[in-house]
Curated annotation (Swiss-Prot):
It comes from the Bacteria. The keyword Repeat does not apply. GO terms for molecular function: ribosomal small subunit binding. This is Ribosome-binding factor A. GO terms for cellular component: cytosol. The lineage of its organism: Bacteria, Bacillati, Bacillota, Bacilli, Lactobacillales. Monomer. Binds 30S ribosomal subunits, but not 50S ribosomal subunits or 70S ribosomes. One of several proteins that assist in the late maturation steps of the functional core of the 30S ribosomal subunit. Associates with free 30S ribosomal subunits (but not with 30S subunits that are part of 70S ribosomes or polysomes). Required for efficient processing of 16S rRNA. May interact with the 5'-terminal helix region of 16S rRNA. It comes from Latilactobacillus sakei subsp. sakei (strain 23K) (Lactobacillus sakei subsp. sakei).
Length: 118
């Protein structure tokens, strides 16, 4: 069963990325990238983790509102593209790992600059 969940997660991630690029025309979701999918074991709920190009909090809030607004369209498109008994309920969450990685990179850069100045 675990293997099936992994395959369905991959398929959902690929399709949601495609739907966001080709079907959703909301300018608030431009620059949104799906980074991870977490599907429940019973295939009823899916958390979609995303990142955005901008670091502004207002852009993150706009992207979240745009994704919440497009949730119905995305779910209906998934229903047409994926053969499942029931299409899972979708929840969008911003992926903080990308921002955390950028923060670590910045700290390392500062450390290397300090060492070079000595």
């Amino acid at each position: 069963m675990k293997h099936r969940v992994g395959r369905v997660e991959q398929e959902i991630q690929r399709e949601v990325n495609d739907i966001l690029l080709k079907r959703v025309r909301d300018p608030r979701v431009e620059g949104v990238t799906i980074t991870d999918i977490n599907l429940s074991g019973d295939l009823q709920h899916v958390k979609v983790y995303y990142s955005i190009l901008s670091n502004l909090a207002s852009d993150a809030e706009k992207a979240q509102k745009g994704l919440d607004k497009a949730k119905g369209l995305i779910r209906s498109e998934l229903g047409q593209r994926i053969k499942l008994y029931k299409i899972p309920e979708i929840t969008f969450e911003q992926d903080g790992s990308v921002r955390y990685g950028e923060h670590i990179d910045e700290l390392l850069r500062k450390l290397h600059q300090d060492e070079a100045q000595r």
